[in-house]
Amino acid sequence: MMTYEYILVRYGEMTTKGKNRSKFVSTLKDNVKFKLKKFPNIKIDATHDRMYIQLNGEDHEAVSERLKDVFGIHKFNLAMKVPSELEDIKKGALAAFLQVKGDVKTFKITVHRSYKHFPMRTMELLPEIGGHILENTEDITVDVHNPDVNVRVEIRSGYSYIMCDERMGAGGLPVGVGGKVMVLLSGGIDSPVAAYLTMKRGVSVEAVHFHSPPFTSERAKQKVIDLAQELTKYCKRVTLHLVPFTEVQKTINKEIPSSYSMTVMRRMMMRITERIAEERNALAITTGESLGQVASQTLDSMHTINEVTNYPVIRPLITMDKLEIIKIAEEIGTYDISIRPYEDCCTVFTPASPATKPKREKANRFEAKYDFTPLIDEAVANKETMVLQTVEVVAEEEKFEELF
């Protein structure tokens, strides 16, 4: 019985790139190799406009499950490779069609003749291949406009690819082509989605989390570690910086008027994150802010908070409503972790009436009454840093180390 031997990957947005496309292709190939480490028999060949993954006996479903989370892949097809002879092509098309799952009633044939010396023209091949499928199936008809299955045949010199099963990739650009950012990872629903969408644009992320023991628990800290771990499904690794924030928050609560405590707290977070970004050679800061969602996410608040950093602040969720954000969180696997009922530092010392239109002048005046610099230095110096990788990759590395 014929089975899938290849997966053909299409790049999508990467095809719009010019002279630097080779960098994008190389990065994507590297990311795919990392993602498929578990499958030692696989061979990958990346060309200018497509990637070919030779399965060599590996389970195509298991491989496909990992490919769907790799940014930079627009679509991919499970494919069979047959000799470029009419009878072989007909048999391959039927075999591929019969492997399609689900309620299939209609199909069409699409032929692309890369090898122009093939003895039959496209219009001659269509009825030959389609007729063979009709003769060997029941209750199946041709529908060229809206078929359940499109049987794609690519004819080349010496061999042809037969494809039916087309699957969507994650889209976007390969992680690593767009530099690095620091993402503020609070533990809520929004910030992991912001990290995901940032990675989708080809940007590597490192996460910064502020925790305030004993006001925040170890379980709240573990929740953030689990979120960062979940995000590794979409990249090679996530470096997480856990910043002790208790003394900063206690001082803000004592020295700053309550209406401005939230604004000043966010400004301190930005200052600390900028310091870490400088250490880690990051180029921007990403947050999970959505315009108007809470008091610290009004335009006035963002204007005042942005003052303390020279780094670009990326806000992927800025125009989304909560339901849109939740939908993405559910799709990427972070929602159930985010809703664990453990408080983060943003809920500590929450003012009754936070300013929704804070002014820079007032924030600067309040901060000038106390020197926060030593507290910022201490928070940066005492941060805990951990590197998280996909669980399967870590297990493979530990298994390898046990051999020595």
From Swiss-Prot:
One of its GO terms (biological process) is thiazole biosynthetic process. It is found in: Cytoplasm. HAMAP family: ThiI. It catalyses: [ThiI sulfur-carrier protein]-S-sulfanyl-L-cysteine + a uridine in tRNA + 2 reduced [2Fe-2S]-[ferredoxin] + ATP + H(+) = [ThiI sulfur-carrier protein]-L-cysteine + a 4-thiouridine in tRNA + 2 oxidized [2Fe-2S]-[ferredoxin] + AMP + diphosphate; [ThiS sulfur-carrier protein]-C-terminal Gly-Gly-AMP + S-sulfanyl-L-cysteinyl-[cysteine desulfurase] + AH2 = [ThiS sulfur-carrier protein]-C-terminal-Gly-aminoethanethioate + L-cysteinyl-[cysteine desulfurase] + A + AMP + 2 H(+). Pathway: Cofactor biosynthesis; thiamine diphosphate biosynthesis. GO terms for molecular function: ATP binding; CCA tRNA nucleotidyltransferase activity; tRNA binding; tRNA-uracil-4 sulfurtransferase activity. Keywords: ATP-binding, Cytoplasm, Nucleotide-binding, RNA-binding, Thiamine biosynthesis, Transferase, tRNA-binding. The keyword Cytoplasm applies. ATP binds at residues 184-185, 209-210, 266, 288, 297. Residues 61-166 form the THUMP domain. One of its GO terms (cellular component) is cytosol. InterPro entries: Rossmann-like_a/b/a_fold, ThiI_AANH, ThiI_fer, ThiI_N, THUMP_dom, THUMP_ThiI, tRNA_STrfase, tRNA_sulfurtransferase_ThiI. Coiled coil: none annotated. The gene is thiI. This is Probable tRNA sulfurtransferase. Belongs to the ThiI family. The lineage of its organism: Bacteria, Bacillati, Bacillota, Bacilli, Bacillales. Catalyzes the ATP-dependent transfer of a sulfur to tRNA to produce 4-thiouridine in position 8 of tRNAs, which functions as a near-UV photosensor. Also catalyzes the transfer of sulfur to the sulfur carrier protein ThiS, forming ThiS-thiocarboxylate. This is a step in the synthesis of thiazole, in the thiamine biosynthesis pathway. The sulfur is donated as persulfide by IscS. Pfam families: ThiI, ThiI_fer, THUMP. Its EC number is 2.8.1.4.
